[in-house]
């Protein structure tokens, strides 16, 4: 099961998000700069949180005697939520996007969206900062809980997944919607379809592919979770109806009245 991470596309997506800034600025970086980038406190915190989340989920699965996830598709979905929670929501969009916890990553964030260059509290970056703070404090922890729910086969998994997918899709709509209705003043748009390395990385990959991915996948998986929730909620009703069909209730009591002879007593 460990080797399957090498064929998981989202693993490559997260790794590329971490290492692309090094490749882009490789001519201006020294070996010490690269080591410093990879050992920044925020980077080490994300790595430690990833390890703790996986270890705690394994312990919980052992404690609840839950079987491991049986299919590659289920394990891939669980990894999607784990990596989204730790790498994307908490580390990149939250700590880096808002608090500039990594200088190199923060510079690259500003290259594809100038709103990330604004200080926290500045009106220009207010929309992305609100979305990113939601990722840091709501969506990130929620995704980690959902990964744990997958590993333990929790009965709360579908509800957590539906809510998580709704928040992810909503955040994407708010993020890109503000730019679309205002003419995209903060994005470096490839209007002339030049497809240079800069545009491929900072527009077509970061904006177009990223927004489509975070709209399509949450809507798809959220819809599946919604259908499972509806089916689960209607199951007790169907079960109750079938039980009443097998064991019909007794007929209501019938009352018959007969005339009573009343004797007049003295």
Language model features with spans:
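Extended, low-polarity transmembrane helix blocks
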Residues: 54-68, 223, 230
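Intrinsically disordered Ser/Thr phosphorylation hotspots
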Residues: 10, 14-16, 33, 44, ...
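Short alpha-helical hairpin
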Residues: 16-27, 111-120
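Eukaryotic polytopic
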Residues: 2-6, 47-49, 69-238
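N-terminal onset of structured domains
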Residues: 31-40
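Non-transmembrane, juxtamembrane loop and terminal tail segments
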Residues: 234-266
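First transmembrane helix
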Residues: 8-22, 41-63
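Juxtamembrane "helix-exit" motif on the non-cytosolic side of transmembrane helices
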Residues: 20-31, 60-63, 177-182
């Amino acid at each position: 099961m460990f080797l399957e991470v090498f064929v998981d596309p989202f693993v490559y997506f997260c790794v590329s998000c971490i290492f692309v800034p090094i490749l882009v600025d490789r001519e201006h970086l020294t070996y010490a700069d690269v080591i410093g980038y990879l050992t920044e406190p925020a980077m080490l915190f994300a790595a430690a949180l990833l390890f703790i989340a996986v270890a705690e989920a394994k312990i919980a699965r052992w404690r609840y005697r839950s079987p491991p996830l049986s299919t590659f598709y289920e394990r891939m979905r669980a990894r999607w939520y784990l990596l989204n929670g730790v790498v994307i929501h908490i580390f990149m969009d939250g700590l880096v996007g808002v608090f500039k916890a990594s200088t190199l990553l923060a510079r690259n964030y500003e290259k594809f969206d100038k709103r990330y260059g604004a200080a926290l509290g500045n009106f220009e970056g207010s929309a992305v900062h609100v979305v990113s703070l939601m990722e840091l404090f709501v969506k990130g922890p929620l995704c980690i809980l959902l990964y744990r729910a997958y590993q333990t086969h929790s009965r709360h998994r579908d509800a957590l997944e539906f809510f998580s997918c709704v928040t992810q899709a909503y955040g994407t709509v708010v993020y890109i919607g503000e730019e679309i209705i205002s003419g995209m003043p903060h994005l470096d748009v490839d209007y002339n379809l030049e497809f240079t390395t800069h545009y491929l990385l900072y527009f077509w990959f970061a904006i177009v592919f990223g927004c489509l991915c975070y709209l399509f996948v949450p809507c798809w998986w959220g819809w599946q979770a919604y259908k499972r929730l509806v089916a689960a909620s209607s199951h007790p009703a169907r079960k109750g109806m079938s039980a009443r069909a097998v064991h019909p209730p007794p007929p209501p009591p019938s009352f018959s009245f007969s005339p009573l002879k009343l004797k007049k007593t003295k």
